[in-house]
């Protein structure tokens, strides 16, 4: 009888330890399983993000190639074209000192000319604006082009933004700051003999929450200052929803 009691006592004393070891093993298995699942999820997320980055890179490169071609088209064909009757009926409005607005039927773009210029620059601005009306007709994000004219050192700004309203309204200083900044960049590049093409860092148009970068191209002209053509190329439409962007200005 005493031996049976001793055996039963030993069995019950070992039972709690067995349960503890079982649960410890179960917890370890669960942790390992969760770790594998988390690692698999992280790897899938990283793979998806890497594919997105590759797609964005290809899209940006395609955009650069397209607008590099447009830059040459504008300089070689649009800006250089002359027509005896192209300037008939053209009008410009002086918004303030050395800032002129090209009057044209309201289409996709508006144009400003900064600095003294002659009628040939006005005609050239009208041709470039009409050309960009076609290219930007279906676009919903802001696009802008700057043309630093080596012939008279004027600066032409053509944009899908409402330039006349912005220049006359409370954002006047912002537009002036952007134009002054672009002119300084373009003049610097025009004087850099070894730099034909350059890119800016990513920028942000604050009131539109639009991110973009600037493509600048220099064209040297014997006997004149260099002409520089710059495009602000938006990237918001190339970025997947939910992907954060920097806050550069």
What is the meaning of each model-derived region?
Residues 1-13:
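Non-catalytic regulatory/interaction regions at protein termini and inter-domain linkers
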Residues 15-115:
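Juxtamembrane extracytoplasmic/periplasmic/luminal helical "stalk" adjacent to the first N-terminal
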Residues 44, 62-65, 123, 177, ...:
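Residue-level detector of secondary-structure boundary/capping sites
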Residues 69-105, 134-156, 160, 195-199, ...:
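Short N-terminal helix-loop-first-beta-strand/juxtamembrane motif that initiates sensory/input modules
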Residues 115-119, 173-176:
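Second-shell loop/turn segments in exported
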Residues 118-132, 183-184:
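Well-ordered, non-membrane alpha-helical segments in soluble/globular domains
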Residues 125-139, 222-249:
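Solvent-exposed, extracytoplasmic
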Residues 138-231:
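Extracytoplasmic/periplasmic ligand-binding sensor regions of membrane-associated signaling proteins
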